[in-house]
Amino acid sequence: MPENIKNVLSGEFHIKKFVLFTITLLITVLVWNLPIDTFGIEGLTVVQQRVIAIFVMAVLLWLTEAIPAWATSVTIIFVLLFCVSDSSFKFLQGSEGEYGQLLDSVGIMACFADPTIILFLGGFVLAIAATKSGLDVLMAKTMIKPFGKKSENVLLGFILITGIFSMFISNTATAAMMLTFLTPVFKALPANGKGRIALTMAIPIGANLGGMGTPIGTPPNAFAFKVLNDPAGLDMGISFGQWMMFMCPLVIFLLVLAWFIILKIFPFTKKTIELQIEGDVKHNWRTVVVAVTFFVTILLWIFGKQLGVNANTTAMLPIAVFAFTGVITAKDLQMIDWAVIWMVAGGFALGLAMNGTGLAENAVKSIPFGQLNPIVILVISGLVCFALSNFISNTATAALLIPILTVVCQGMGDSLGIIGGTPTVLIGIAVAASCAMSLPISTPPNAIAYSTGLIQQKDMAKIGVIVGLLGLAIGYAMLICIGKMDMIAG
């Protein structure tokens, strides 16, 4: 009998999950029913207390993984709709606002179609079209040629190309694609040499770091991008191109640094590599459509602010063009990572609940955030994010930390100037999440690379910790510098 069927029949795995879920439920109910004075927040309403309980539920479910991370996000939206919205049960609404400000149910459900979600969908559709047409293979072949045959240069080429692809294409898809390209290369390398380890490690490192380069590179970026640009919140007007302007140089620097570290720890014994990238490129009009649309979309993302077109609107371009030209079919839509989309939506809903019910405002007024040391907040938030993201989804980590830190930053006000302002803290979370890559479970690219059997967990931990902590330190230093020079705000 297959092992997975045995696990299901035995119930051992599910019993553990059930116990964790039950504990989470009990703690949530406890927080839900605590006396309001317990929280120490002046003016706290019943509705706001419910939001705190829902937030506690989200934290525990994401940390324990009692249910899948995307299911937690759906649960958040479900509980918000039924318990704190204007469409919840009447006995939960009270009469004439006696329980506090209720959320607009339409606004909660709109989190599934938030403009930033559309931005992500545009990125997913671009990736599907590039893979389907073979454009990704063509680009990889073209981009790797200048690096020649010298082993060290080939390694540099792969880590840079992986990083660049990960800015616009899912880092999971990028890692899978690039490792496929390396399969014939491994056959030519000594079985007991360190070159195989070096090349294999280059892929997840490149994919994880490269994701920092654009707002769509990884979900934590999208969270920070959304909060910083929210018209009802910080409204800083940071464009897609501005994000790339200060993050891409950081990414390139970290990729080159990672290349140097990998070479030092896992040097090649074979000095040259014969590289043959395998894959089909379809030479037809649809490939031309994909290529033109791909580059026009990227150009509009970069320069759209000057033309009056924002990044979210631009994301509809590839979706529409590929739909009416038949490049993307209904079946292709199944390839979109809907779990990630729903996870992001759940995080947005949490932020909406904290702001829409007035909880964030009351917390800012009642808790003396202004007395906190900005540097301590920056360091602790970064290290907590880095640590958590090594063990749980970095999307879940960002969804937990960014709403809290947004409130903290609003309460600290001008005192954050010493570290470059609120963007340093929030974008710093995105950086910390991307730098967390010490274990096979840390990120999907890590898991894919580990599954090849060419690297051991100790190899991944060694490179992941060194590159991750250096990336964290350098990334924060850069954010502080550009923040103090007012280069981030739109």
Region locations from a protein language model:
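Membrane-embedded alpha-helical segments and adjacent helix-loop junctions characteristic
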Residues: 8, 71, 75-193, 339-340, ...
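Transmembrane alpha-helix interface/packing and boundary motifs in multi-pass membrane proteins
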Residues: 60-68, 161-170, 204-216, 300-306, ...
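Flexible hinge motifs at transmembrane-helix junctions and intramembrane kinks/re-entrant loops
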Residues: 42-45, 57-75, 81, 85, ...
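Structural signature of hydrophobic alpha-helical transmembrane segments
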Residues: 42-52, 113-122, 171-175, 248-254, ...
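Juxtamembrane and boundary regions of transmembrane helices in multi-pass small-molecule transporters
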Residues: 2-39, 126, 132-135, 191-224, ...
